Amino acid sequence: MPRVLVDCGNCGPDFNSIRQMVSSHFSAKVLQTHGADDTLKLLRERKVDLVTVNRKLDRDYTDGLDVVKRIKADPDVGNVPVMLLTNYEEHQQSAIAAGCERGFGKLAMGDPATCELLAPFLSE
């Protein structure tokens, strides 16, 4: 069964870029959510291998770290790995302190190092 990545808070073009990057390197399905509520709902409904959360959510510019904290605080799904998508190291450090795996920025989308970060979660 293919791995599943849930991408939260990205606009359509960025979501499609992430989906294309993932599908070109892994046999994984990429699903889109837009905020904490629909992400938590999806995490409760199916097995998810990784969640990526945009630093600033596309629809309302909510801080993605708030989504991360809600996921990590949930006793039913808090063990699902989460990455914050940001180009800024200080935000990566805040995310790691909140329980995230090291994420990546959109500027590094095509880098081999990004695939190396994703491989432990999306490789079969």
Residue positions per predicted region:
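Receiver (REC) domain switch/output surface
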Residues: 113-124
